[in-house]
């Protein structure tokens, strides 16, 4: 998974990126992000689509308290084109990506902490949901959630 995100304010944020992965059923997925989600929904601000350096979830009062408190180097909300086995599934997938502090325990991937905000930032989470009014994906639960550990981020050269 490789992406670039620009946090340029509430109306100028931008994203570009591609993720490719294979699910347990052998399906090959490709997600291509090319535009941000800017519209906030209740209790879930999107900060113009991209935000850098945000403590949220858990006890922060930002987004859901039902998951650990994390430190996110970058969080973004975008729309994307999604392909399954090279066949277009949707041009309007709703995507949320975070490069965040480590939350998972080695070996079984269970949550390792409730306040994970001081852990090393080395985890990428990718959540892909059907667009509004679209059918569920042909995947367990109807959506995709991919987690990469031991990930790194880099600041682009100015």
Regions found by a protein language model. Give the residues of each.
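Predominantly extracellular/secreted and cell-surface proteins with exposed
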Residues: 1-91
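Acidic, glycine-rich flexible loop segments
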Residues: 54-135
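Residues in flexible loops and secondary-structure boundaries
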Residues: 39-44, 105-107, 154
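Edge beta-strand at a domain terminus
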Residues: 28-38, 125-158
């Amino acid at each position: 998974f490789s992406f670039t995100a620009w946090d340029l304010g509430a109306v100028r944020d931008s994203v570009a990126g591609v993720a490719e992965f294979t699910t347990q059923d052998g399906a090959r997925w490709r997600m291509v992000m090319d535009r941000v989600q800017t519209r906030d929904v209740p209790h879930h601000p999107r900060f113009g689509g991209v935000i850098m350096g945000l403590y949220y979830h858990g006890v922060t009062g930002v987004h859901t308290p039902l998951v650990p408190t994390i430190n996110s180097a970058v969080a973004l909300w975008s729309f994307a084109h999604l392909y399954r086995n090279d066949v277009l599934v949707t041009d309007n997938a709703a995507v949320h990506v975070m490069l965040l502090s480590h939350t998972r325990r080695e070996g079984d991937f269970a949550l390792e902490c409730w306040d994970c905000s001081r852990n090393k930032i080395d985890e990428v989470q990718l959540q892909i949901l059907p667009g509004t009014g679209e059918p569920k994906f042909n995947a367990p639960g109807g959506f995709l959630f991919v987690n990469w550990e031991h990930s790194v981020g880099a600041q682009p050269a100015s």
